[in-house]
């Protein structure tokens, strides 16, 4: 009986050892995302498929502000891209080829190409004073692309301080209005807080589209990234 009891103890200990084993796994893309974000790579996606009946053009815009006042940017800050291309806009021969190949997005509803998603991406350049911003409209394939540079400013109150960071915050998405500019993101500089003797970029986690956020009053330099559909 004693021998059987000892055997059971050894077997149980062996099973526990296996249960507590550390198993190596391959890292997934989700595991890499925090590293990309920390390095300055960010992508924001928006579903625009429901706008197909009310919009055929998108104006992609970057607005720059210094101390709350809009200023003229050095680089191109606006692009007009078609979000909807109809089969009927082609000549008769082209329409026939499209239908023969079955290459239309929705032949029944006269849609050849349709943008269903808007991607906004941020890519750091090998320069701490420039940030690249890209817009891409996609459907079953890329529909349109626009890229520009945002020139960052040195907003340190003391040049012995480290270089200031810029931060991203989203705007709240409210009811769609055709022809109205929709702010989607802010990319803004932190500011010096004399009370805590530190730089801050705090406030609303999502900004109101009516531009009343205190953060817009405090940040000395920021960009508003948005779109208008017509």
Predicted regions and their residues:
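Structured domain cores in non-transmembrane regions
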Residues: 52-161
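Mature extracytoplasmic/lumenal regions of exported proteins
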Residues: 119-229
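Hydrophobic residues positioned within well-ordered beta-strands of beta-sheet architectures
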Residues: 44, 60, 223-225
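Sec-dependent signal peptide cleavage junction
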Residues: 18-40
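Short edge beta-strand/loop segments characteristic of extracellular beta-sandwich folds
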Residues: 45-49
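Short, surface-exposed loop/turn motifs at beta-strand boundaries within globular domains
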Residues: 36-43, 53-55, 218
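Residues in well-ordered beta-strands of folded domains
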Residues: 7, 63, 226
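Bacterial Sec-dependent N-terminal signal peptides
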Residues: 1-24
């Amino acid at each position: 009986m004693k021998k059987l009891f000892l055997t059971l103890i050894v077997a149980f200990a062996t099973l526990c050892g296996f249960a507590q084993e550390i198993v190596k796994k391959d890292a997934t893309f989700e595991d890499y995302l925090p590293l990309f974000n920390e390095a300055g790579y960010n992508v924001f996606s928006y579903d625009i498929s429901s706008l197909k009946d009310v919009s055929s053009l998108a104006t992609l815009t970057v607005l720059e502000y210094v101390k709350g006042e809009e200023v003229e940017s050095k680089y191109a800050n606006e692009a007009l891209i078609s979000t909807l291309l109809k089969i009927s806009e082609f000549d008769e021969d082209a329409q026939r080829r499209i239908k023969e190949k079955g290459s239309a997005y929705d032949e029944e509803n006269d849609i050849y190409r349709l943008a269903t998603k808007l991607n906004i991406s941020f890519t750091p350049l090998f320069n701490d004073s420039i940030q690249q911003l890209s817009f891409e409209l996609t459907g079953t394939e890329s529909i349109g692309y626009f890229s520009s540079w945002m020139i960052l400013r040195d907003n340190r109150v003391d040049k012995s301080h480290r270089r200031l960071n810029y931060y991203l915050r989203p705007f709240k998405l409210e009811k769609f209005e055709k022809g109205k500019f929709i702010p989607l993101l802010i990319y803004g500089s932190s500011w010096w807080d004399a009370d805590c003797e530190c730089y801050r970029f705090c406030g609303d986690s999502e900004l109101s589209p009516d531009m009343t956020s205190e953060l817009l009053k405090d940040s000395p330099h920021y960009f508003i990234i948005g779109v208008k559909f017509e």
